[in-house]
Amino acid sequence: MNKAKFGPMLLALALFAVFLLIPTRFLLPLLSDEKVEQAATSLKEEKIQSMILQQKMLADPKYLPMYGSSEFARMDAFHPSNYFKVKPEGFTPFLLGRGGTQDLVHVLNFASTMDQLKDKKIVFVLSPQWFVPQGIDETHFAPNFSKQQGYHFIFNNDLKPEMKKQIAKRLLNFEIVKKETLLKISLEGIAYDDTKYKVKALAAKPFAYIYRNILDRKDLFTAMFNIKPHKEKLDPSLKQMNWEEARKHADQTGAVESGSNEYGIEDDYFNSKIKKKLKQREGYLKNDAYDQSPEYEDLQIVLDLLKQSGAKPLFISVPVKGPWYDYAGFPKERRELYYKKVHEQIEKAGYPIADFSNHEYDKYFLKDHMHLGWKGWVYIDEAIQQFYKAN
C-alpha cells in the first residue's frame, strides 16, 4: 500500500533529479532553431545573459557572433542585422551587447563558451567610452552581470590558473557579485591562496553546482518563451547597391534625419538630449581621457581568452564624433592616444583590427556623438563581409 502511495512521488523526484543533474548540453535540443533565429537581433537582458542561446548559436555555423555594447540598438536599415537580411552573404549576425556590456562582461561570455570558440569567426566592436579612468563601474556592470555565467566560470577547469585567478579577483570588485554568497565564496577560493578560502570554496562546491544547474534550467525556459526579435527596419533598395552607392545613400539618409543641427546628430537624439543643454555642454569633457583605464587590462583578458580558445576575431575600433568632442573640450591629441593604444594592443595580440578612427569628421558615420549609424554601419558591413569571406 505504501509502495503504491509513494511510488509516483519517488519516480517524480528521480526524474527531477535527472533533469537537474544532467549536463546542459543534453538540453540544447529542447530549444528550437527558430527561437535562436528570433533571438539573433534581441537586445533583452535575458538574451544577452543567456548561456543556452549562446551555446546553441555557436553550434550553428550560419551565425556570426557580434560582441559589443549600446551601438547595436541603433538599428537603422544599414545595421548589419538589417543589411545582411536584405543582401545575404551566407551568415546571420547574432548580437551580444547592449548598454554597459564592456570587456569584463564579454570575458564571462567567452569564459563560459570557450570550448565552442575554436576556429569560430567573431566580431568585437570597441567603444572609446568604455576606457574612462575608472573603467566599468557598478552601474554598468550590475545590470549586465549573469550569475549563470559566473557559476559556469568557477567550474571551467580549462582556463589557465593564473588567468582564472585574475578574472576571479576582478569580479570580486563588484557588489553585485559579492551579494551572491555561494559565488563569492567560490570566487574567493580561486582568487586567494589562503587555506581558509580554499576550504570554504570546497564545502560550497556541491551547492554551487546544483544552483548552476537550476539557473541553466531557468535559462532554458526563458529562452523558449520570453525572447522576441527586435523590430526590423529593412531597405530593399540596398540589395542592388555596391558599397560606394550604399555609403552615398547612407549620407543622404543621415542628412535628412539630422537636419536640426550642425553636428550630424540624429534629430530625435539631439532634440531630446542635447538641444536644451547645448550651452552647458561646451567644454564639459575637457578633463576626460581614455588612455589610462582598467579597461585595458580587461581587454587584455579578452585577448588572452580568445587566444586560448582558438577563436578568430575581427576587432572594430569606432571613432567619436570629432566636431562634438571638439566643442565638448576633449582635444583631438588626447583622443589619438586612445586610438593608438588600443590599436597597438590588439595588433600585438596578433589579431586584425578594422580601425575607423580617421572617420571622426565623417559627418554621418555616427548617429550621435558616440554611436554607429548610417554611413558608419555601411563601413562596418563591408569590413564584416570581407572578414567573413577571407580564408
Residue ranges with predicted function:
Residues R25-K47:
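Alpha-helical transmembrane signal-anchor/signal-peptide segments
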Residues M57-F78:
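Catalytic nucleophile-elbow at a beta strand-turn-alpha helix junction centered on a G-D-S/GDSL motif
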Residues F72-E162:
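Membrane-embedded segments
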Residues L96-R98, E333, Y338-N391:
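C-terminal regions of proteins
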Residues G135-F141, Y325-R334:
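Short, flexible/disordered intra-domain loops and linkers
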Residues Y151-E297:
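Secreted/periplasmic serine-hydrolase-like ester/acetyl group-modifying domain
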Residues D288, L306, L314-V318, Y325:
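Substrate-recognition/cap regions that form aromatic- and gly/pro-loop-enriched pockets
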